[in-house]
Structure formats: C-alpha cells, structure tokens
C-alpha cells in the first residue's frame, strides 16, 4: 500500500493553523471525502465535534467542502465520538465526521471519519480519500449544492441509547459517583445518563471554555478525580477523555483502574453470566497481568497493533466481542461499533451492582505487572528505532528480563514521539531498564 500523506492511526490530526489542520485543507478534505463516501444516495453526513475553540472554524470548512460535493451536513454540536458513530447509523447517513484531537491539548485538532455502518474507515478507503486530495477541487452545479442544518435532538437520542445498554433489572440508586468529563464532549451527556439511572453524581471537568479540554482533568490526568473520590467518600469515579471514547476509572480508595482492568471485569462478568463469546483482544501495550488473569479463567487472549482500529480488526477477524487498550479504549461489539466510554462504564457498573462487589474487589483477580512508559520526543530525519545503539540497548534489556517481562518500542501514530515501554515483575528494575533504552533513543534522535 502507498505511504499515507495525511491519515494517521486516528484520522488526520495536527496543530491548528499548521498543515494539515487549516481551513483550506479541511474544506478540501470534506470535498474529497464526499467524492469517496457518497454512495448510498441519502447525501447526509453527520458532523460532531468536541469542545475545542477551533471546532467552529473547522466545521464551517467541512461544511463548505461537503456542500461543494453536493452533500448535506447535519451538525450535532459538541458530541462524543461514539455518539456520532451511533447517529450516523440511526440517521442512515453516508458517513459521520468527528472534529476532535481526542486526548490531545486544545491547540491540536483533527478530523476522523465513520462509515455508514458507524465503523472507522478501512485503510483502502482512507487512501482513496487521499487520492482525491491530489486532484483539483471541483463543485457540483448550483442546484445540486448541499445544505447544512442542526440535529437538535442528537444529545437526547444518544443519552437514551446509552441507558438502553444498562440491564433494566438493575439501578444505580444508592451509588455515589464522581464523573470527570475532561471539559470535553461528554460534559452534557454523561451526567444525565448516570443521574437518570438513579445515581448521586458529583461532577468535575464539566465546564468547557474552548481551551481547557483535557487540561489537568479527564482520562489522561486522573489526579483531580482521585482526590475528589476520596474527599467525597464516593463509591468510585469515572473519567472520560475529550471526545468520550476513552475511559479510566478510580476505585473508592483513589486507585486508578485502566482499560486493561475494565476489559477484564467486563469479560469475567460475561463469563459468569454464560454470555461470553470467544475471547478478549488487547494490544502490544496490554499489561501481562491481564493476559495471565484471563488465562487463569480459561478466556482466550490475543494482541493487536496499538490503536483502536486494529483492536477492531482483530475482533472481527476472530468474531469476538470484547477488546480494549490500556489507555481506555474499550470496544464492546455486542453493543456498539466503536470505543464508547459511557457504555463501557455502564457495563462495569452493572458488574458492581449485580455482584454486590466494590470496584476494587472486582479488580483483585488481576495482578498488574509494573509497566513503565517513557516518551521521547522525536523530530529528526533519522529513525532512532533503526539505530544500532537502540537495538543493542533493547537486546540487553530483553536478555535480562527473559520470560518475565517485555520490551516494546514504537512510534506514536498521533504525535512526534518514540514510546519506550518496559514491563516486568520488579518495578525498580523495570524503571531502570526503560530509562536505559530511552537514553539510547535520545542519543540517536
């Protein structure tokens, strides 16, 4: 396959105002996507965004490009990424588009696409869009130009859908839950879902102002949530990222519960109910503790490349239903078509309520291996992963770990970073080994 120019592991992403996240490029991207995706005849495209201030500018640019291709833009306003996937299906739209850079800071933004089935686009479709981007932009005749309108009931539809995934015989009554919406797209959705199911809720990160998305709140920084759960003596806390496709939880003692543990809880509960189909898909970053815990339950486990799209591919390949990344993407194919943090949270809570166990107790069956991740900024021409010094450092650490640990080096798909991950039984040694490799990477950049 030809090398990509624009699409990364999660759409097109970058710093606002610099290529490719500029109004002129995004307008042409909308047009190019329209040329490739407009095959159903409905001519409708659902467009959602998170709470970044640049979302206003970029949705206008997308609208212009789609209109030039003869498509109708339907705006949801701030809306979680999985909500756009859901609404794309229910409105029988040609495609869904999300304007978001997910967990990144506010000055980044991105564009990602969903097919008419509510799934992320396969590689060949993204390459077809890139091919259209190399062509001169054209415009349909005036009578065929697209129009734009707003979907005023989008939030209500999605709230009802989320609630429908929670068992009707259960209730959240009596639970005190702290919800952290990262000042992002779930700020007006998640509190209503949990409140309407009966919980007492306390919110943080629910006051977006355009520039505070993911800032010291949300799934990538749970310190505020941890403190609030302990302060309020809550049963647990739930943190979402800026676009609502990642979830991290916090138990009653303020301890972090990541995507690996969440998937383990959901899979074990499905096994208990006799409803588990197949096994669980993790990634190269999934903690070895999850693999061991699932094996002890007799649940099959396989790893995919890093990225929720690759988790999805492996799920479909195996005809399984549960997949996750430790960063908090949790995919439950019996309920959704993409990672949905609110729906994943509800399944964990259903296990808490149904088993009458605490979140901490549900996590106790899985012992996490110490895992250290060091990010090294990479902006040079040379590929440090091809350096003899880096290869030697990796080989040395792998020899020392033997069968009791792992080393993973990879380039980030969304940022100019080399990620160095070392995992093993001894936290002190793992930290030392990770720094040894990271130092070699820095010297080779």
UniProtKB/Swiss-Prot annotation:
The modification Phosphoserine is found at residue 102. It catalyses: alpha-D-glucosamine 1-phosphate = D-glucosamine 6-phosphate. Mg(2+) binds at residues 102, 241, 243, 245. The active site is at residue 102. It comes from the Bacteria. Binds 1 Mg(2+) ion per subunit. SUPFAM superfamilies: Phosphoglucomutase, C-terminal domain, Phosphoglucomutase, first 3 domains. GO terms for biological process: carbohydrate metabolic process; peptidoglycan biosynthetic process; UDP-N-acetylglucosamine biosynthetic process. One of its GO terms (molecular function) is phosphoglucosamine mutase activity. Keywords: Isomerase, Magnesium, Metal-binding, Phosphoprotein. InterPro entries: A-D-PHexomutase_a/b/a-I, A-D-PHexomutase_a/b/a-I/II/III, A-D-PHexomutase_a/b/a-II, A-D-PHexomutase_a/b/a-III, A-D-PHexomutase_C, A-D-PHexomutase_C_sf, A-D-PHexomutase_CS, Alpha-D-phosphohexomutase_SF. Activated by phosphorylation. One of its GO terms (cellular component) is cytosol. PANTHER family: PHOSPHOGLUCOMUTASE (ALPHA-D-GLUCOSE-1,6-BISPHOSPHATE-DEPENDENT), PHOSPHOHEXOSE MUTASE. Catalyzes the conversion of glucosamine-6-phosphate to glucosamine-1-phosphate. This is Phosphoglucosamine mutase. It comes from Aliivibrio fischeri (strain ATCC 700601 / ES114) (Vibrio fischeri).
């Amino acid at each position: 396959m030809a090398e990509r120019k624009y699409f990364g592991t999660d759409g097109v992403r970058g710093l606002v105002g610099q290529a490719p996240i500029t109004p002129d490029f995004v307008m042409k991207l909308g047009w190019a996507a329209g040329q490739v995706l407009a095959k159903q005849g409905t001519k409708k495209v659902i467009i959602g965004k998170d709470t970044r201030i640049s979302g206003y500018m970029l949705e206008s640019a997308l609208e212009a490009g789609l209109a030039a291709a003869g498509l109708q833009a339907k705006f949801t306003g701030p809306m979680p990424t999985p909500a756009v996937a859901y609404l794309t299906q229910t409105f029988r739209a040609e495609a869904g588009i999300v304007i978001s850079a997910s967990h990144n800071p506010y000055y980044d933004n991105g564009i990602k696409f969903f097919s008419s089935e509510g799934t992320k686009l396969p590689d060949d479709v993204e390459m077809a869009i890139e091919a259209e981007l190399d062509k001169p932009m054209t415009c349909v005749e005036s009578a065929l130009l697209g129009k734009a309108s707003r979907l005023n009931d989008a939030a209500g539809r999605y709230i009802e859908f989320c609630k429908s995934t929670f068992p009707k015989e259960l209730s959240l009554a009596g639970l005190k839950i702290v919800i952290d919406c990262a000042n992002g797209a779930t700020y007006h959705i998640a509190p209503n879902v949990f409140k309407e199911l009966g919980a007492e809720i306390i919110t943080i990160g629910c006051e977006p102002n355009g520039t505070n998305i993911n800032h010291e709140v949300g799934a990538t920084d749970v310190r505020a949530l941890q403190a609030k759960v302990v302060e309020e003596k809550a049963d647990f806390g739930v943190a979402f990222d800026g676009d609502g496709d990642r979830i991290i939880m916090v138990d009653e003692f303020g301890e972090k519960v990541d995507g690996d543990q969440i998937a383990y809880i959901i899979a074990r509960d499905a096994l208990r109910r006799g409803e588990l189909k197949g096994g669980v898909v993790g990634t190269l970053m999934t903690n070895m503790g999850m693999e061991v815990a699932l094996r002890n339950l007799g649940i099959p486990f396989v790893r995919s490349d890093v990225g929720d799209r690759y988790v999805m591919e492996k799920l479909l390949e195996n005809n399984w239903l549960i997949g996750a990344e430790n960063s908090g993407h949790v995919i439950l194919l019996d309920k959704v078509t993409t990672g949905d943090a609110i729906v994943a949270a509800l399944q964990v809570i259903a296990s808490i309520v149904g088993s009458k166990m605490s979140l901490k107790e549900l996590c106790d069956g899985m012992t996490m291996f110490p895992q250290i991740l060091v990010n090294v900024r990479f902006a040079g021409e040379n590929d440090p992963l091809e350096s003899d010094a880096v290869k030697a450092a990796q080989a040395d650490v792998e020899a020392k770990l033997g069968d009791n640990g792992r080393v993973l080096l990879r380039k980030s798909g969304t940022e100019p970073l080399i990620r160095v991950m070392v995992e093993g039984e001894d936290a002190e040694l793992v930290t030392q080994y990770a720094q040894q490799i990271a130092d070699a990477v820095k010297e080779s950049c």
